[in-house]
Amino acid sequence: MKKLKIAYTDKALEIFGEVFKDYGEGKPSVTGKTENSSITCYNISSMTKGGEIFAQISEVGGKVVMFNAYKPCGEVKLSDEECIEKAGTFLEKLGYKDMKCVWNYASGGTEHLNFAYTEDGVIMYPDLVKVNVCMETGTITGLDADNYLLNHTDRLMKKAKHTIGEAFEKVNVNLDVKDERVAVIPIGNGRETLAYEFIGTHNDSVYYVYIDANTLKEVEIYKVVNTEQGTLLM
C-alpha cells in the first residue's frame, strides 16, 4: 500500500511539472491530500521566481482540479479575445476539450473567464471551468474545474418538444433580444434541463432568460450587474 501511495504522489508531481514547466524554476512538493467537493486530490505547491503556485491534482485520472499562480498583473496589454484564446489553448492542453467561453470580465489586470463544455452546438452549463488570465503577460494564473469534473458525463439528449421560435414567444416583449442559444442548465438538486437561452437588454440592463425547451416555462432569469468585484450575473 505504501508503494502504491508513493506511485500516486509521484504521478501527481509529474503532472504538475508538465503543466507548469513554463512558470519558472521551482521544486514542487506534495503538501497533503484532501477531498475537494467529493474529488480526492493531492495538494502540491511550488515556489518559483514568479511567485508561489498551489494546485490540486485528482487522484483518479490525474486531472488539474484547481490551481492558483500568485503573480501580480500590472499594465493591460492583451485584449479580451487574446485572453480567451490563451485560456482555450491551456484548457485543451489539460484535456478539457470542446470548451466555449460563455462569460468573461476584466478586473484588476486579470481576465476572468467561464468556459462550458459544448456538444452539437448545445452549451452544457453544469460542465463549467473557470480560468483567470493575466492581461499583461497572458499567463494563466488560476483555474477551477470542480464543477466540470463533478458533472461531466455522456448525456442522452432527447429532442426538444418545442422550437426556439416557440420559446421566443414566451420571452417578455420588453426584452430586446440580441442573441439566442441552446443550453443544458442546472435546476437544483442535481437536476438538469434543456433550455433556450435568450440574451437581451431592457432599460440599459442586460438579462439572460432561460425557457425550458420541453415545457416552455421560464426556469431562470439573470441580470448583469456591475460591482466592485467585476461584472456578475445575479
Regions found by a protein language model. Name each.
Residues 1-234:
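Long, terminal "pre-/pro-" and other extracytoplasmic accessory regions
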